[in-house]
Amino acid sequence: MNGEIITVAVPKGRLLEESSALFERALGVSPKRLLDGTRKLAADAPEAGLRFISIRAADVASYVEHGAAAVGIVGLDILREEPRDLYEPLDLGIGRCQVIVARHKQAKPLPRGVAPRVATKYLSLAAHHFARKGIPAEIIPLHGSIEVAPSLGLADAIVDITETGETLRANGLVIEELVLDVSARLVVNRVALKLHAERLRRLIEALRRVCAETATPKVR
């Protein structure tokens, strides 16, 4: 492919597996296979005119917003927790999970007028959720082992992300409310969108077709 190579930021972990399957079907290149073959965090696919970089999921939006990557794959939880100036053309339908409110299954209702203590890494999402309900919650920032906070008396509830709920149940927690349904989104740097309009349009449409095929049940 002619022209400047376009950098795509893909998150490490499970989303790398799922996004690689989409790119392979859409463009014939697998970020995971390319990156597995090197110790570097970047690998080129010259035939597609792309360079893939593998970074922490929480950092993808920053790389794209500031132009270090033209395109990225980001969970909706990250985008809504810290809004960015990004073009968000496509729900990829992968990495599905939920941001929820959970409490200990043996927790007693709080006295009327008492603000609940809520442990979470989603400070903005949690604050907005309880504010919408008119509840003046005390938000306690944590970055790991959030599920144990209620049993240790640190918090009355947590706001966390879950896929199956198994870790919550293992720690005696029950889901009480949904905060946000989450899936991975394709995001694009706005300057890159102007500089590489046609190439990025083709990339987006190729992924859109694959996502539509995946979402549509096949008739037998």
From Swiss-Prot:
EC class name: transferase
Domain of life: Bacteria
An MF annotation (GO) of this entry: ATP binding
EC numbers: 2.4.2.17
A Pfam family matched in the record: HisG
InterPro entries hit by this protein: ATP_PRibTrfase_cat, ATP_PRibTrfase_CS, ATP_PRibTrfase_HisG, ATP_PRibTrfase_HisG_short
Catalytic activity of the protein: 1-(5-phospho-beta-D-ribosyl)-ATP + diphosphate = 5-phospho-alpha-D-ribose 1-diphosphate + ATP
Keyword Transferase set for record: yes
GO cellular component assignments: cytoplasm
Keywords: Amino-acid biosynthesis, ATP-binding, Cytoplasm, Glycosyltransferase, Histidine biosynthesis, Nucleotide-binding, Transferase
Localization of this protein: Cytoplasm
Listed pathway(s): Amino-acid biosynthesis; L-histidine biosynthesis; L-histidine from 5-phospho-alpha-D-ribose 1-diphosphate: step 1/9
GO terms for biological process, alphabetical: L-histidine biosynthetic process
Quaternary structure and partners: Heteromultimer composed of HisG and HisZ subunits.
PANTHER family documented for this protein: ATP PHOSPHORIBOSYLTRANSFERASE, ATP PHOSPHORIBOSYLTRANSFERASE ATP-PRTASE
Domain characteristics, as noted in the entry: Lacks the C-terminal regulatory region which is replaced by HisZ.
Biological role stated in the UniProt entry: Catalyzes the condensation of ATP and 5-phosphoribose 1-diphosphate to form N'-(5'-phosphoribosyl)-ATP (PR-ATP). Has a crucial role in the pathway because the rate of histidine biosynthesis seems to be controlled primarily by regulation of HisG enzymatic activity.
Family that this chain belongs to: Belongs to the ATP phosphoribosyltransferase family. Short subfamily.
Alphabetical list of HAMAP family matching this protein: HisG_Short
UniProt name for this protein: ATP phosphoribosyltransferase
Encoding gene per record: hisG
